[in-house]
Each structure stands twice: as structure tokens, then as C-alpha cells.
Design a protein with these regions (language model features):
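Class I S-adenosyl-L-methionine
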Residues: 124-125, 145-422
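Short acidic (Asp/Glu) and glycine-rich catalytic loops that position anionic groups and cofactors
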Residues: 38, 272, 458-462
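C-terminal target-recognition/interaction regions appended to catalytic cores
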Residues: 14, 308-577
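Short, flexible loop/turn segments with low-complexity composition
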Residues: 70-79, 219-225, 525-544
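Core alpha/beta nucleotide-donor-binding catalytic domains of modification enzymes
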Residues: 3-15, 21, 25-178, 189-203, ...
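Short, flexible loop/turn elements at secondary-structure junctions
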Residues: 20-23, 52, 138-140, 189, ...
Length: 577
């Protein structure tokens, strides 16, 4: 029949399963991938998250994605007025019910959750065949340098008995059962050096990823910085999986491990292309100014007795403390520093239009922001920016915030602990130990920000706003912009929970680029994967013209130089096999 002939020429639409989804950063990026005709080849059909606040954010965004970018008017009214959230189940019952099916509040590894997931995974495989993608990153607390340092301080802590070290096996179990065409696994850079039983955990992770299901070839998104003589040899090093977000046009120096796996029968031979070459390289790095300039100027709050007048007096007092403290500087530097500090105090106390703590008007991007990033972030339908209220600070910290911000503005670097005058040192026993030299760190206008992490939920000392006149730490929305979440992405929960969600997420703008590259790579398949006859197909997307793959060869082929001893294959959850 003509219809069948036409359908046979159409490329496959891939069903995406998002594990450890958080607020949905990876899913947001993959959902935005489209061809020249506006067709979206990736459809997120299942997201799994265990934290209630993050799941609430994920559920709302899953609901909104069903409106194909044209969100309901009620949503914008909700964001603008700050009124109670509409009852979506009443207004849009079909879309809300579907969202509740797609976004699941579950903890992987729990019997009840695994039983439910088995049924859903089998349904997805039945409908889409092998044309599925798995994305996500197991929680990183056990692998991060900060988390490991914290664990070492716990009496009786035994890494081998910490289940957080083995959460990645839940991911492996899903791969084994679903056998997706490809997967994306994300984690912190500290995973490369984390060890269990005197063995590097990352070696075990890579081994398990390669052998999951029907077997996978692992590929790297990073440019080659050393020669690779034979593409048939698995010569990738662990560091080849580290992605520097600033190299992909993000306004943040975020370095994360991202492993891309392609099922071996999908690309059964190495091909003449590197996956990183499918992502356009950025000639200019995005900066803090690109995304924070153009946002409303806000004042910080005070943790006690906050008011506009009290805040102005607190900044005035902080300025006096800083001016006295910098008397140790050389004469010329001291005068310039004091002049700028006094300007900030004047803004706080004599401004005819006092700063508020929340944004009450739309926001723009910096004039130097790239058009692609600007288009990604901004939404002309927004009346105000959501999640953009400042937090309260101790009055005693304002002098340190003011010093750090003025220092960064004038010296173009963030001050270390040793750069602070002694009179500004906080009452921390470890202040002079050297372990926390960046305890008070200001972000710099003309540089990518430092890594936005969940620690921003604890205090704002490490994320001081670069404008000293605002004398504060970043808001949730400012952190979200540095993480490249669109302005219309609403984070639910209290402010601490919102910060945690933003800090733990994969930047959506980076996820979108990874999705673009992965889809282009999947178009190089010589034939449709076996078992995909029942897969859903999508409108035609032209195959890209691509010049050479930074890939590993099939498991079992290795050079003498690249050979590594592999650990024992661990027992996996049998319910997900």
C-alpha cells in the first residue's frame, strides 16, 4: 500500500527513558531536538525521580511539553500573579493524566518501584522496538570530592557498604532489559578517581556499560587531544569522557563525565566521524554577563529585621567596615577601592528608586549573548521572572560580599582567603587553613561562572553576584540561567529545594546539543536495528553529511597499551533483567 511504502522511508522516532531525572534538564534538551521541518525525533515517554520537590517540577514540565511549546495562558498567569497553581487536572485532564503516567515518583532499586518499571519498560519496548534511548545520571554524592571528604569523617563508614556507590547498577539493569539503541550517562568528574576495594569504580562502570544487554560501543564527546593510531582499538581513557560545558557555549565552567553508548548492532563498525564533530564548536565562550546582565537589579535581604531602610543602613555600615579594612592596600589602589565601595553605599541609601528583593518586570539577556542562547532562554510571554527572589543574609556577611564583589570588578579575579584583610575574616576556625580559600567567591562578569552545585542551597558565599551594588548572592533564577534553564522553567518546592534541583541538573542547552549529535549519529545506521519492526516512525529527516568517530572498538579488541584488568561482573537486580 502507498502508506506503507511511504512509512518505510521515514526515519524512526525514538522513545526516551529518563532515569534519576531530577527536575528534567536532560529531558528538556532532548525534547527540544528538531529537524529543519520542526519535527522532534526524541519523545520522552518515561521519567523517574525519587525526590518529591524535583518530581513536582518534573511533572509540571512534562505536562507543559504536551502543548508543543505553546503553553496554556493559565500557566503564564500563574507565574505573573504568584497566585495558587491552577488545578491542571480540571483544566486539561487528558494532558495532566498523561504527564502523571510519564513522570513517575519512584526510587530505583526498591521492589515496588522495580515491579512497576518492569511493566512500563516492557510496554515501551513493545511499542518502539529497539528504537529507544536511555538518559540520566545516578546520584553523585558518593563520587564527588566533597561527598567523599564528608564520608571520611563519618565514624565506621565503609564505602563498600554504601548503596550510593552502586546506584549506577540500577541504570545498567534498565539497559539490560530495554536494550536501547543508545544511552547517555552523566556524573561528576570525581567518579574518575572514586574507588571501591582498591579498584577504580569508573573502570567497573565502563565495563558494565559495555556488556549491558546486547553490548555497547562507548564514544566520547570531547575533542581528541592526543593521537589515536587505530580506531579498532579501545584507546579511550577515562578523562576522554569529561565534558567542559564552557566549550559548548554555556556560561558556566562545569566539568562532568558524560558517557555515550551506542548498541553494537546499531553501528556494527567504527565510522569515520567523531561524535564531538557533530556539535558545532563555539569560537567565543559565553560569560556570566551574557545571561545575568539585562536581569532586574535586586537587593539582598537581611536574615533579621529586613526592610529597605535597614538594608540600606546595613550596606552603609558594611561599606564603612570595608573602607577601613582596605587601608592596608597601596595608596592608589586604596582610593579606587574606597570610591567604588562608597558608590555602592550611596546606591543603597539614596537611590530614589530603591531596589526590591523580587523581579517585578521581564528580563533580557546581555547584549553580547549569542542569538542561539538568547532564543533558548527568553520567553516574550513572561511578565515576570519566576524563582527570582533574593535570600536573606547576615548583616555581618555583607561587608565580605561587598569586598569580594568590588575586588572582582577591579582586579578581575575572585579574592582568595589570603586576599581578604584580616579584619574581614569570618569567625571560622579553618579560614586560614587553606582548605577553604574560596569560601567567599564572586562570579566574574567576563568569565563563565564556576560550577553551579547543590551546595548553593546551603549559603550563597560561593556564589556572590558580580554587581557590588546589589551586595548579595545569586537567586534561583540566576543560577538557573547559568545552568541554561529557559526562563519559563518553573521550579517547585521551597527555595532550598529549588537550589538543589538547579545545582544537580544537567544543563538543558548542553543536553540539546548532545541530543542533536546523537540523532545525527544514529542516522548513519546502515539498516534499521533488528526487532524494530513495530517501532513508531517519524517524518523524514535528511541524513547529515559528516566528515570521522572517537569510538571504542567492540569489546574484546584491545592494544597492549590500552589493556586494563576488568573487575568481576557484579550481581544485578534480577527483577529488571
Amino acid at each position: 500500500m502507498p502508506l506503507n511504502k511511504e512509512m518505510a522511508q521515514l526515519p524512526v522516532q525514538f522513545a526516551v527513558v529518563d532515569l534519576f531525572a531530577g527536575p528534567g534538564g536532560l529531558a528538556e534538551g532532548f525534547s527540544a531536538v528538531s529537524d529543519a521541518n520542526g519535527h522532534h525525533p526524541f519523545k520522552v515517554v518515561l521519567s523517574v525521580e525519587k525526590e518529591k520537590a524535583a518530581h513536582s517540577t518534573l511533572l509540571l514540565r512534562t505536562f507543559l511539553r504536551q502543548f508543543a511549546g505553546k503553553f496554556p495562558d493559565e500557566y503564564y498567569a500563574f507565574l505573573k500573579r504568584g497566585a495558587p497553581e491552577p488545578d491542571w487536572a480540571v483544566l486539561y485532564p487528558d494532558q495532566w493524566n498523561q504527564a502523571n503516567q510519564d513522570a513517575q515518583l519512584l526510587e530505583l532499586g526498591q521492589d515496588a518501584a522495580d515491579k512497576l518499571l518492569v511493566g512500563k519498560i516492557d510496554q515501551i519496548r513493545k511499542l518502539y522496538g529497539n528504537n529507544t534511548i536511555v538518559i540520566g545520571g545516578p546520584p553523585c554524592q558518593a563520587y564527588s570530592l566533597v561527598g567523599r571528604a564528608r564520608n571520611r569523617g563519618i565514624v565506621g563508614y565503609i564505602p563498600e557498604e554504601d548503596p550510593k556507590h552502586f546506584l549506577y547498577k540500577n541504570y545498567i539493569d534498565i539497559l539490560t532489559r530495554l536494550r536501547p539503541a543508545a544511552f547517555i550517562m552523566e556524573n561528576v568528574k570525581g567518579m574518575l578517581s572514586s574507588s571501591i576495594n582498591d579498584g577504580l569504580i569508573f573502570k567497573k562502570v565502563l565495563s558494565d556499560l559495555r556488556s549491558a544487554g546486547d553490548g555497547y560501543r562507548l564514544v566520547s564527546l570531547t575533542p581528541r587531544v592526543r593521537p589515536q593510531a587505530d580506531l579498532l582499538e579501545p584507546t579511550l581513557l577515562p578523562t576522554d569522557f569529561v565534558i567542559r560545558s564552557e566549550d559548548f557555549g554555556l556560561p558556566q565552567a562545569r566539568h562532568r563525565v558524560i558517557v555515550v553508548g551506542i548498541r553494537k548492532d546499531v553501528l556494527d563498525k567504527p565510522i569515520a566521524v567523531r561524535l564531538d564533530q557533530l556539535i558545532p564548536r563555539c569560537n567565543m565562550k559565553a560569560t556570566v554577563a551574557d545571561v545575568l546582565r539585562g536581569m532586574p537589579k535586586l537587593r539582598s535581604g537581611l536574615s533579621r529585621e529586613d526592610s529597605i531602610a535597614n538594608w540600606g543602613n546595613a550596606v552603609k555600615n558594611a561599606a564603612a567596615i570595608v573602607c577601613k579594612a582596605v587601608s592596608v592596600l597601596p595608596h592608589d589602589e586604596r582610593d579606587i577601592f574606597r570610591a567604588r565601595v562608597n558608590e555602592c553605599a550611596a546606591v543603597a541609601t539614596t537611590n530614589p528608586h530603591p531596589l526590591s528583593r523580587a523581579a517585578l518586570k521581564p528580563a533580557k539577556a546581555g547584549s553580547s549573548c549569542s542569538e542561539s542562547l538568547k532564543k533558548w532562554l527568553l520567553d516574550p510571554n513572561l511578565g515576570v521572572l519566576p524563582n527570582n527572589e533574593t535570600r536573606g543574609h547576615m548583616a555581618s556577611d555583607l561587608s565580605r560580599y561587598l569586598f569580594a564583589a568590588v575586588y572582582g570588578e577591579l582586579v578581575k579575579v575572585s579574592p582568595k582567603a589570603s586576599d581578604f584583610p584580616k579584619s574581614l575574616a569570618p569567625e571560622h576556625l579553618n579560614w586560614n587553613s587553606g582548605k577553604f580559600a574560596d569560601r567567599f567567591r564572586v562570579q566574574l562578569w567576563d568569565q563563565p561562572s564556576t560550577t553551579i552545585t547543590s551546595h548553593i542551597s546551603k549559603d550563597g558565599h560561593y556564589f556572590i553576584h558580580p554587581d557590588p551594588e546589589q551586595c548579595r548572592s545569586l537567586t534561583v533564577r540566576e543560577a538557573a540561567r547559568l545552568q541554561t534553564f529557559p526562563d519559563n522553567y518553573y521550579f517547585k518546592g521551597n527555595r532550598t529545594e529549588q537550589f538543589v534541583q538547579v545545582g544537580n541538573a544537567v544543563p538543558p542547552f548542553l543536553a540539546k546539543q548532545i541530543g542533536d549529535a546523537l540523532y545525527a549519529l544514529l542516522q548513519l545506521r546502515p539498516n534499521e536495528p533488528k526487532g524494530a519492526s513495530g517501532a513508531v516512525r517519524a517524518p523524514h529527516m535528511p541524513r547529515p553529511v559528516i566528515p570521522h568517530i572517537n569510538s571504542e572498538a567492540p569489546v574484546g579488541q584491545s592494544s597492549q597499551k590500552a589493556k586494563r584488568k576488568r573487575g568481576r561482573r557484579s550481581e544485578r537486580n534480577p527483577s529488571l533483567r
